[in-house]
Amino acid sequence: MSKPKAKKIFLGVDYGQRRIGLAYAASPLFISLPIGFIEAGKTLEATAQSLAKIILEREVSCVVLGNPIPMQIGQKSSLQEEILKISSLIQEFCHVDVVLWDERLSSAQAERMLKCDCGLSRKQRKGKTDSVAATLILTNFLESSPSIRF
């Protein structure tokens, strides 16, 4: 008799210096759902600890962290440096896999979606944009990586 497969749980993260959008997907369906956002902490360590709490509470097995790759090849942004540090801290605190995923234009796409579909004001869209962007990041990752489902 074969052992049942462990449930795979993913957390999508749209990292920002003010707010961090979050999305969730779990086996067997792997449908990405927005789960809100958290405010960034005063330090990277504080932010990573807030994320670690969510990761441990939800028993996440893999974090998909949006990586804002600049449009021009060879450039690196200060935000990318923070994301690399956050990635290392998450791995240190939680011992989970962290995948850096290209998030170019995900926030802009999320903003357009909310503006067109919901009729919300800019103020009302603020936090929702971040969690929708995290959902887009996680969905793109899951759709381009079908082997992770098995």
UniProtKB/Swiss-Prot annotation:
<keyword id="KW-0963">Cytoplasm</keyword>
<keyword id="KW-0540">Nuclease</keyword>
<dbReference type="InterPro" id="IPR012337">
    <property type="entry name" value="RNaseH-like_sf"/>
</dbReference>
<dbReference type="InterPro" id="IPR006641">
    <property type="entry name" value="YqgF/RNaseH-like_dom"/>
</dbReference>
<dbReference type="InterPro" id="IPR037027">
    <property type="entry name" value="YqgF/RNaseH-like_dom_sf"/>
</dbReference>
<dbReference type="InterPro" id="IPR005227">
    <property type="entry name" value="YqgF"/>
</dbReference>
<keyword id="KW-0690">Ribosome biogenesis</keyword>
<dbReference type="GO" id="GO:0005829">
    <property type="term" value="C:cytosol"/>
</dbReference>
<protein>
    <recommendedName>
        <fullName>Putative pre-16S rRNA nuclease</fullName>
        <ecNumber>3.1.-.-</ecNumber>
    </recommendedName>
</protein>
<dbReference type="GO" id="GO:0000967">
    <property type="term" value="P:rRNA 5'-end processing"/>
</dbReference>
<comment type="similarity">
    <text>Belongs to the YqgF nuclease family.</text>
</comment>
<dbReference type="Pfam" id="PF03652">
    <property type="entry name" value="RuvX"/>
</dbReference>
<dbReference type="GO" id="GO:0004518">
    <property type="term" value="F:nuclease activity"/>
</dbReference>
<keyword id="KW-0378">Hydrolase</keyword>
<comment type="function">
    <text>Could be a nuclease involved in processing of the 5'-end of pre-16S rRNA.</text>
</comment>
